From Swiss-Prot:
Produces ATP from ADP in the presence of a proton gradient across the membrane. The gamma chain is believed to be important in regulating ATPase activity and the flow of protons through the CF(0) complex. CDD domains: F1-ATPase_gamma. The keyword Cell membrane applies. GO terms for biological process: proton motive force-driven plasma membrane ATP synthesis. It is found in: Cell membrane. SUPFAM superfamilies: ATP synthase (F1-ATPase), gamma subunit. This is ATP synthase gamma chain. NCBIfam families: ATPsyn_F1gamma, PRK05621.1-2. It is a peripheral membrane protein. InterPro entries: ATP_synth_F1_ATPase_gsu, ATP_synth_F1_gsu, ATP_synth_F1_gsu_CS. Belongs to the ATPase gamma chain family. GO terms for molecular function: ATP binding; proton-transporting ATP synthase activity, rotational mechanism. Its main location: membrane.
C-alpha cells in the first residue's frame, strides 16, 4: 500500500510540473496572438486599397494573361500554409484536410496539382507519406515578413507565367487559416490567379465600401496592371501568412488551456486516490495494531 501511495504522489508532482509548462505556453501564445493580430490589422488597409486598385484596372483590361482563363486548364498550384511547431491543436490537420479536399476537387476536374508547402509540420506530413512537393518553406510561420511572402510569390508567379507545356501552371490556389476569433479559426481555400473579376453594381459597391476612386492610368491600364498584379499576389500571400500566424497562436493557446485544465483535473483525481490509499493504509495499520493487541491480550489470559 505504501508503494502505491508513492506512485500517486510521484504522478501528482509530474502532472503539476506539466501544468506549469502548459500554463506558461498558454500565456506566451496569448501574447503572440495580440502581436499577430496587430500585424494583420496594420496590413489590412494596404490589402484593401491594392485590391480596389487592381479591380479598377482589371475592369478596363480584359485580355491580360493574368486575368484570362485557360481554355483547357491542366495544371494547378496549391500553396498550403501550416505550422513549424506542434502543440497547436488541429491547426495543421485542418489545413492539410482542406488542401486534400481541394486537391481531390481539382483532380476530378482533370487538373494535375503541384503542392507548395509552408511549415515544417506540413512538410513532414507529406514527406512521411512520400507525397511530392514542388517547393517548400519553413522557419517563419509564427512571425512571417513581407520578404517571405515575396519569396513565395516569386516562385508561384514564375510557374504561372511559364507555359503549361513546359511545366507551368494555369491556376494558383492558396489554403490558409482564417482568424475569426480567439476561439474560432477556419481553414479555407481560395484562388488567387487567374484573377476573378466579378461584375458588381457600382451603387451596391459604393454602399458597402464608400465612393469608388477615380483613376487615370499612365502610360496605360495594361502597363499599370503589369506592375500591380505581382504586388497584389504578394500581398494576398502575406495577408494569408499573417492570418494563419494569428490562427496558429490562437489554436495553440486553446490547446494549452485545455491541457492545463486537464492536468489540474487529473491532479484532483490523483489527490483523491492518494488520500483514499493513505486512509486505507492507516486503517490497515490500525487493524494490525488492534489485532496484535487482541492477540497479546488473549495470550496473557491463557497463560494465567
Amino acid at each position: 500500500m505504501g508503494a502505491q501511495l508513492r506512485v500517486y504522489r510521484r504522478r501528482i508532482r509530474s502532472t503539476k510540473s506539466m501544468a506549469k509548462i502548459t500554463r506558461a505556453m498558454e500565456l506566451i501564445a496569448a501574447t503572440r496572438i495580440t502581436k499577430a493580430q496587430r500585424a494583420a490589422e496594420a496590413a489590412a488597409p494596404y490589402a484593401r486599397e491594392i485590391t480596389r486598385a487592381v479591380s479598377a484596372v482589371a475592369a478596363r483590361v480584359s485580355d491580360h494573361p493574368l486575368l484570362t482563363e485557360a481554355e483547357n486548364p491542366t495544371r494547378a498550384a496549391v500553396l498550403v500554409i501550416t505550422s513549424d511547431k506542434g502543440l497547436a491543436g488541429a491547426y495543421t490537420a485542418n489545413a492539410i484536410k482542406e488542401a486534400e479536399r481541394l486537391t481531390a476537387l481539382l483532380n476530378e476536374q482533370g487538373k494535375e496539382v503541384l503542392t507548395y508547402m509552408v511549415g515544417r509540420k506540413g512538410i513532414g506530413f507529406y514527406k512521411f507519406r512520400e507525397r511530392p512537393l514542388a517547393d517548400s518553406w519553413e522557419g517563419f510561420t509564427e512571425r512571417p515578413s513581407y520578404m517571405h511572402a515575396m519569396e513565395i510569390s516569386s516562385a508561384l508567379m514564375e510557374k504561372f507565367i511559364q507555359e503549361t507545356a513546359e511545366g507551368g501552371v494555369d491556376e494558383i490556389h492558396i489554403v490558409s487559416t482564417e482568424f475569426i476569433s480567439m476561439i474560432n479559426q477556419r481553414a479555407r481555400a481560395s484562388r488567387i490567379l487567374p484573377l476573378e473579376v466579378e461584375e458588381v453594381d457600382s451603387k451596391v459597391l459604393e454602399a458597402e465600401q464608400g465612393p469608388l476612386p477615380l483613376y487615370e492610368f499612365e502610360p496605360g491600364a495594361e502597363e499599370v496592371l503589369d506592375q500591380l498584379l505581382p504586388k497584389y499576389v504578394t500581398n494576398r500571400i502575406y495577408f494569408a501568412l499573417l492570418e494563419s500566424a494569428a490562427s496558429q497562436h490562437a489554436s495553440r493557446r486553446a490547446a494549452m488551456k485545455a491541457a492545463t485544465d486537464n492536468a489540474e483535473e487529473l491532479v484532483k483525481t490523483l489527490t483523491r486516490q492518494a488520500n483514499q490509499a493513505r486512509q486505507a493504509e492507516i486503517t490497515n495499520e490500525i487493524s494490525e495494531i488492534v489485532g496484535g493487541a487482541d492477540a497479546l491480550a488473549a495470550a496473557s489470559a491463557g497463560s494465567e
